[in-house]
Amino acid sequence: MAQFSESADVPDMGRRQFMNLLTFGTVTGVALGALYPVVKYFIPPASGGAGGGTTAKDELGNDVSLSKFLENRNAGDRALVQGLKGDPTYIVVENKQAIKDYGINAICTHLGCVVPWNVAENKFKCPCHGSQYDETGKVVRGPAPLSLALAHANTVDDKIILSPWTETDFRTGDAPWWA
């Protein structure tokens, strides 16, 4: 009987080593497959709009149309939409045909409560600890340490687009703390 000599070119892989490699590959594939939705959940989707903007959404998750948004609103009205990072954001009506060029993030800078607009007093009043903000979102009474964050509000194809505000805060003259 002839002896088969091993060549130096062919690696010697035993049955145990092959099964270990196969098991490792299978477990790795399953783990990566299970990890994909978790990673996708924490990375926000890139939305439409110029300059990295996000299309404003209504309470049902539908895009907000400017013409429908302005139908039943008057100058000075503020209405909540879902804005950047999913945060509630106030859109301010300028007149029957236009909105202001900024939106106001409705998250209180004290403890993160949603701050409602008080029409009677013409200011935002936090229900959690009494912080107050003027009509532009500038803090006028604590304990909130900072003004409400701003976002640019524009329209593209009748859709309201919100984009990050990175310029000087027009209310305080300071660099934006949220950028």
Swiss-Prot record:
SUPFAM superfamilies: ISP domain (SSF50022)
Cofactor note: Binds 1 [2Fe-2S] cluster per subunit.
GO cellular component, one term: plasma membrane-derived thylakoid membrane
Ranges of residues in domain Rieske: 61-162
Residues that bind [2Fe-2S] cluster: C108, H110, C126, H129
Gene Ontology MF terms in the entry: 2 iron, 2 sulfur cluster binding; electron transporter, transferring electrons within cytochrome b6/f complex of photosystem II activity; metal ion binding; monooxygenase activity; oxidoreductase activity, acting on paired donors, with incorporation or reduction of molecular oxygen; plastoquinol--plastocyanin reductase activity
Subunit structure, as described in the record: The 4 large subunits of the cytochrome b6-f complex are cytochrome b6, subunit IV (17 kDa polypeptide, PetD), cytochrome f and the Rieske protein, while the 4 small subunits are PetG, PetL, PetM and PetN. The complex functions as a dimer.
Family: Belongs to the Rieske iron-sulfur protein family.
Protein name: Cytochrome b6-f complex iron-sulfur subunit
Species assigned in the record: Desmonostoc sp. (strain PCC 7906)
Gene name in the database record: petC
